[in-house]
């Protein structure tokens, strides 16, 4: 039974439907999550521009619905204008709601830092323009992006249809391109990565920080609930 004192975690998700990403129920089955959807049309800078100004309004909606903390669960949506913008967006959400707020870009940074990663191989769903912006964001934050392999997807629905074997192969190619990396960043919150993470870590011997699992891990930590993630989904979630 859910403790009535357990903080509700609010999530702003890029797709239109107000659905909590499936990773939440697998990783933290006892925690309460709620969501509101931005209705982003494409995984491109133009798609981000169309919805970014509504993020703060969605944060306020989640507060009205009882959220105690809020996460913007979009990686590229929060890094595409750079590190300073990610911080400013987080501050704007906090100022409007008075609640602790975070973003998925902050989550992956926190995950990489928790694992003492300095040099990171990039495995992404994105087109080249977005990959370049991700590399620049990581460099601004003091990390060394090392190589990149990507799927070149722009469709929101297509992200969720990428299968586990494709994700594992993508990560293998990323580490082959940058074999001296400390970890792999598997970037895009729309990818279903939970089953790929343990296989990649077993095969390659390096940790994987993936957008959506890291987003849940970070939001739960911010909420201060003390809940632990379900086991078997990689080093970060087992830390």
Q: Can you say where each PLM-predicted feature lies in the sequence?
A:
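General beta-strand structural signal in soluble alpha/beta enzymes
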Residues: 71-72, 101-105, 147, 186, ...
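Hydrophobic alpha-helical
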Residues: 169-200, 216
């Amino acid at each position: 039974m859910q403790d009535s004192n357990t903080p509700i975690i609010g999530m702003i998700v890029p797709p239109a439907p107000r659905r909590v990403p499936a990773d939440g129920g697998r990783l933290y089955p006892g925690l309460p999550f709620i969501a509101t959807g931005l209705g982003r049309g494409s995984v491109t800078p133009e798609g981000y521009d169309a919805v970014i100004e509504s993020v703060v309004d969605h944060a306020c909606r989640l507060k009205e619905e009882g959220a105690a903390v809020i996460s913007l669960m979009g990686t590229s949506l929060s890094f595409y204008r750079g590190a300073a913008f990610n911080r400013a967006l987080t501050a704007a959400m906090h100022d409007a709601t008075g609640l602790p707020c975070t973003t998925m870009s902050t989550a992956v940074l926190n995950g990489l830092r928790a694992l003492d990663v300095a040099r990171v191989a990039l495995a992404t769903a994105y087109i080249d323009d977005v990959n370049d912006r991700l590399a620049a964001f990581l460099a601004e934050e003091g990390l060394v992006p090392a190589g990149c392999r990507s799927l070149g997807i722009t469709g929101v629905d297509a992200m969720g249809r990428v299968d586990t074997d494709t994700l594992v192969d993508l990560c293998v190619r990323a580490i082959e391109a940058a074999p001296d990396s400390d970890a792999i960043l598997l970037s895009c919150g729309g990818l279903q990565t939970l089953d790929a993470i343990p296989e990649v870590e077993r095969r390659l011997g390096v940790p994987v920080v993936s957008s959506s699992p890291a987003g849940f891990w970070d939001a739960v930590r911010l909420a201060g609930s003390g809940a632990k993630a379900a086991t078997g989904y990689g080093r970060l979630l087992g830390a």
